[in-house]
Swiss-Prot record:
GO-annotated cellular components: cytoplasm
Pathway, per record: tRNA modification; tRNA-queuosine biosynthesis
Protein's name in the database: S-adenosylmethionine:tRNA ribosyltransferase-isomerase
Assigned EC number: 2.4.99.17
Amino acid sequence: MNLSEFDYHLPDELIAQEALADRAASRMLVVHREQGRWEDRCFRDLPEFLRPGDCLVLNDSRVFPARLFGHRSGVHSLAVGKNNPKRHEFLSGAVEVFLLRAVSQDGRDWQALVRPGRKMRTGERIVFDEGLEAEIIARGEFGERTVRFLGSGDLYAAFDRIGHVPLPPYIKRDDSPADRERYQTVFAREKGSVAAPTAGLHFTPEVIERCQAAGADVATVTLHVGLGTFQPLHQEVVEEVKLHTEHYRITADNAGKIGAATRVVAVGTTSVRTLETAARDGVLEGETDIFLYPGVPFRRTGAMLTNFHLPRTSLLVLVSAFAGKDLMLAAYRHAVEARYRFYSYGDCMLIV
């Protein structure tokens, strides 16, 4: 199977640059797999498609301000007297650090993307605001770095103060204070994601209450979203694709709710990947690099709410595997013609 089969054309003006003022006002394209058809609805209509015995599964991972801006720290010698060099540090060269995930037990070593990457060598230090400092300690096979934050103190508190919201690159603007709220689901709890589980952005407490009133139970899972989930794939043969790993967890209580459901309605591809990993491996917590493509069975997911995805990505392949490639690509063409809003701050699709 070739990756070129999972491509489509999207005009730039359909890529949502701002969140709607009302989370639940998004449009929702409902795709009926068995009938091979779709209908245009509003997200607020979601409870109409739920029934007693359903379990709505939400990813409660919380986005943290993962973009840090600092400067390279160099060493400069200043001669003071004939044989008395005094060394002091000077700042040179702007550096951006995009944190991906903590990789050490104490939480001070992080996998990160560093720009400009080619100029930053192992052993170099980066100085951020408030005196926060990090050292590059390793280079990864995909060009990422491992950085170690020096000193002590609560790193997440420091990130909250000096970090920026990690908006995706297709949102062509700087982050704003409003993004701290809107690029976060109302049910986010567990810090660790560098990208929002975007299907959850549409929910309000009122919509969740209406889903429960329709007879659906609500469970949460946690998958900390990494950058690799959204990146374009570089392997042309779909079956050869290898994804980056992400950490997931399902509590025993939530596993019980999911197991008792007659139909599991997964909110977002991250919830799908968590559910399908646990069903495949029989493990409620661990690392997953599961890649769902046409031909791979879905063991637990009965319906799915998802946003619209970029061409040639693992997520477009995933929804095509769930709904059928031809039906999914036809639905995407309709969404373009009907001028739906695309990607993270855009509209959503319900696949039943």
